[in-house]
């Protein structure tokens, strides 16, 4: 009873005095609030990409910014569980018809220069939160088999999807170890799908059997 009253009080307080910083917004999120975030729309003509939440929602945007620029992983405790459930649901049909199927979990990589600049890769943090829920060890974490070998301009600075696709050509490199395996790519946000499409094409060229992608937002 007391806990319910506290939740009601916090809800009223947030309405009267809404949080003004991304940190304050993220700090107030719990499992229930994260589960109730607005769902993302499908990525047009890319049904292999599975985004969770609608990016323009202020809470979703706060999660992304806190993770990407401040390494705030608090929401991943809950988001990792959601991702894992979605992934297992997706691959269950594959396992039914192919018991020998191998599934690689690969975060979208960044270049070494970008890693030095930022200190971490937020996509790796998301992937690791998924692994923490993979108690049956269904997924093999394999970031070493997929690298970004060329820096590319930030998408927001590109004028068109065609230009973005052109900038991305040849920026990834896949290890032959992906041959014959199913790959699940992890990223924070999908906008046009250009980065994920180039990643997928590179993995297919290296022999991946199929490639899916999951993102927090779209």
Feature-to-residue mapping (PLM):
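Glycine-rich phosphate/pyrophosphate-handling loop used in enzymes and phosphotransfer proteins
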Residues: 1-218
